[in-house]
Amino acid sequence: MKKIVGVLVLIAIGLYLSLSVEAEKVEEEAVRVSDNPVFEEIYLAGGCFWGVEGYFQRIPGVYQTEVGYANGLTDKTDYQHIKDTGHAEVLYLKYDKNTVTLPEILAHYYRIIDPFSYHKQGNDVGSQYRTGIYYTDEATGEVAKAFLEEKQKAAKEKIQIELQPLKNFVVAEDYHQDYLKKNPFGYCHIDLDLAYVPLDREVIGH
């Protein structure tokens, strides 16, 4: 019996190490940028930010990610109080537009959320889990607006994604950053393997 337990422990350790190595490999591959990168940024709310970050960290051209809380009623908040302060869980993305375009970023975002769900994504319910696109420059806002308008034309239901200028952003606690890299078996409401599936017709304006 002890031998069996020992073998199972070794298998579990091996699997964990394998997943950790794979996570590092994914990060190295996904961070690829062009020889002459042009960086832009956007903030995306898509439910629990662990999965949203884990997904976009697999996309080549995504240079930096950081999870936090955005567009609330106050300039300060934390994980324990976002329900009261009205913030959404969001992912900050810094990307090289010469490697991945904004329409492609938006198409990736749209495929991993339920755009018709109000204040609910996966098993998570509440205003902090709403969907939203927040921008810091008008050009990004216009592209996002056109993208959502095209999606709405093809939809039978009302799209619940809010589109707003970024009002405020509070960086989340350290244990939330790179959560799925630190916890390979952690909760995730998103199919991360979708990151490797070509966008094809999902892209608008590219």
Predicted regions: what is each one?
Residues 2-206:
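Flexible coil/turn and secondary-structure edge motifs
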